[in-house]
């Protein structure tokens, strides 16, 4: 297996925009690679016609544009593909930009299996067999592969492994952080639809029944202290934080960069808010996490 996943030097001489062209065999993971680049902050254009690539670059070079990193996914829709790629390279060279080419590939057996699982036909298959379509594409793209800056063989890579390869090459500091949202809510208003994990903290005494705490929220120090000093609260936070650390590590390995943890109480005003804030503080001890708290039902009463 060839997997030249290493840091690839930015060769844009103009300094205005960095361009990556993602190409390779159909079914080898171009789309997944594009999603990873998007997560890393790249502006991604999927299946952009070759004649429009230079226009997109010109837009990125224009004053006021926020596009500094452009990734374009190019697939083999015509037999003039190699010539199209050469034309794009030549046009960009006139703008002092040398695009980096990422070539995605996989073994024939792997590609056949993926196509059969997805029940799709190969773009070059036509009246031929699937294997013949794959072979034709390999021959067509051989010149592109020979000059690619980065070749990634996805035959034995999981989605997480492919993500790691792309991040090592283009992520700068070795990869993006995982964004975690700790969301408090009230069960009487329904479950958050986007939650990855839901925890019920109604086992803790409700400050609603304490007259001086009732009008306050879980963000107030008096309510926070009341909730966090109830029996079992500290033990719960310690245990749940330890559990979440294991889950977050698994999410990272699988390439998932966004996670929502929902913490619920009756109305989403006292207990869930205090626990969510405390949990956010614990999770922020992990420097690879970007953590925020969201209080969905606060002020709803």
Swiss-Prot record:
UniProt keyword terms in alphabetical order: ATP-binding, GTP-binding, Nucleotide-binding
Gene Ontology terms for molecular function: ATP binding; GTP binding; molecular adaptor activity
Domain of life of the organism encoding this protein: Bacteria
GO cellular component: plasma membrane
Function: Displays ATPase and GTPase activities.
Family to which the UniProt record says this protein belongs: Belongs to the RapZ-like family.
Entries under PANTHER family matching the protein: RNASE ADAPTER PROTEIN RAPZ
Note: Was identified as a high-confidence drug target.
Protein name as annotated: Nucleotide-binding protein Rv1421
Originating species: Mycobacterium tuberculosis (strain ATCC 25618 / H37Rv)
């Amino acid at each position: 297996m060839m997997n030249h996943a290493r840091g690839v030097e930015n060769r844009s001489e103009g300094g205005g925009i960095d361009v990556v062209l993602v190409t390779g065999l159909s079914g080898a993971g171009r789309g997944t690679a594009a999603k990873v680049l998007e997560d890393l902050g790249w502006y991604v254009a999927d299946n952009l016609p070759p004649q429009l690539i230079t226009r997109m670059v010109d837009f990125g070079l224009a004053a006021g544009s926020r596009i500094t990193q452009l990734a374009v996914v190019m697939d083999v829709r015509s037999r003039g593909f190699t010539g199209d790629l050469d034309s794009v390279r030549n046009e960009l060279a006139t703008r002092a930009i040398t695009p980096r080419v990422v070539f995605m590939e996989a073994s024939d057996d792997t590609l056949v299996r993926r196509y059969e699982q997805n029940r799709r036909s190969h773009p070059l298959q036509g009246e031929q067999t699937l294997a013949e379509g794959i072979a034709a594409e390999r021959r067509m793209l051989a010149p592109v592969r020979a000059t690619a800056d980065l070749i990634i063989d996805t035959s034995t890579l999981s989605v997480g492994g492919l993500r790691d390869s792309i991040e090592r090459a283009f992520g700068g500091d070795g990869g993006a952080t995982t964004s975690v949202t700790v969301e408090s809510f009230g069960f009487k208003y329904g479950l958050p639809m986007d939650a990855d994990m839901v925890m019920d903290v109604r086992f803790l005494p409700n400050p609603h029944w304490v007259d001086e705490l009732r009008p306050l929220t879980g963000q107030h120090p008096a309510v926070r202290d009341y909730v966090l000093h109830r029996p079992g609260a500290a033990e719960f936070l310690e245990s749940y934080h330890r559990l979440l650390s294991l889950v977050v590590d698994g999410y990272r390995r699988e390439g998932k960069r966004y996670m929502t943890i929902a913490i619920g109480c009756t109305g989403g005003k006292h207990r869930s808010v205090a626990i969510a804030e405390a949990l956010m503080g614990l999770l922020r001890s992990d420097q690879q996490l970007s953590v925020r708290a969201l209080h969905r039902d606060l002020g709803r009463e």
